[in-house]
Curated annotation (Swiss-Prot):
Species of the source: Methanocaldococcus jannaschii (strain ATCC 43067 / DSM 2661 / JAL-1 / JCM 10045 / NBRC 100440)
Family affiliation: Belongs to the gamma-glutamylcyclotransferase family.
Superkingdom of the organism of origin: Archaea
UniProt GO molecular function: acyltransferase activity; gamma-glutamylaminecyclotransferase activity
Record keywords: Acyltransferase, Transferase
Name of the protein in its database record: Putative gamma-glutamylcyclotransferase MJ1514
Amino acid sequence: MEYVFVYGSLRKGFWNHEPYLKNSKFIGKGKTKEKYAMYVNIIPYVVENEKISHIVGEVYEVDEKTLKRIDCLEGHPDYYRRKKVSIILDSGKEIEAWLYFYPESCGILVESGDYKDYRG
């Protein structure tokens, strides 16, 4: 089993959550330990080399099959690139989880690091 940190369309209440994560164990809400930059250009994405804000999201425990399905959705490794990062859960616990990064910035900067702020 692996942990995956989701910050956009895979979060609960967004369009990709049910098809991909409805049977996965919810671990908790949290944010990245390090700062990154979130942009939206139709869909949200995070850029690793810009240090703007902590990215807000949710952690799920997923099996290998689910992780491969998410890799396919995200176009890993050709479109998004998956990397393990430290996540601080709202409980205060720190865990390592996969996060999908995009290689370049374009679109609208989400300064808060929370896609829900952008979506209203």
